[in-house]
Curated annotation (Swiss-Prot):
This is Lipoprotein-releasing system ATP-binding protein LolD. One of its GO terms (cellular component) is plasma membrane. Part of the ABC transporter complex LolCDE involved in the translocation of mature outer membrane-directed lipoproteins, from the inner membrane to the periplasmic chaperone, LolA. Responsible for the formation of the LolA-lipoprotein complex in an ATP-dependent manner. It comes from the Bacteria. It comes from Anaeromyxobacter dehalogenans (strain 2CP-C). The gene is lolD. ATP binds at residues 46-53. Gene3D superfamilies: P-loop containing nucleotide triphosphate hydrolases.
Amino acid sequence: MAEPVATPTVELSGVRKDYVAGPVVTPVLHGVDLTVGAGEFTALMGPSGSGKSTLLNLIGLLDRPTGGRVRVAGLDTAALDDDAMARTRGRTIGFVFQFHHLLPAFTALENVMIPMMAARGRAAPDMAECGEHLLRQVGLGAVLHRRATQLSGGQQQRVAIARALAMAPRLVLADEPTGNLDTHAADEVFALLREFNRRAGITFLIVTHDPRLADRCDRIVELVDGRIVADGPHRRSGA
């Protein structure tokens, strides 16, 4: 008997996105087709202004396309109202950004607990246990109760990774997660993302300008002027 085929984590079909300012319409994405399978570790590359952040916003259920279809974890976003999109986003997707956006007055543990408290509307003892477990997994067991401002840049980004994993997402979207780090810290953070991908089967889509890191992904998707121009295990020559 054949093994069941896992539902792709991301499916985009003919996706277009225009931004409208009065009478001016600015097309940003032009008929993008993209499928990201469950458990893939994919880099998204392209020059500034190519539409990478716009694409990530659509996949992250932070915006809706002008045309085409977006499916995340098997759900067609066209069938979801705004509340349902927010619930799906909270349950299904984790985010890691170049700027970690930690609350400076909160401890590492409190920052990781924020998504859990937002989902339940209150704090609970099991949240602290989960947060501690995640922070230990990212190597921060010794600084659980240290405020964000007392942590190094690499440590702060590790807290952000733990926070992104707090709701056990199927998909993590990482937008330049190593952009503010030195080479050593960037390698450590990238290795952590890869470890969670391999150990937990989480799908990762990582925006990066760093070809050295992109080459360590399973797949590289290149976006230029709102169109996918390459998709495979290697970058285009000279890209």
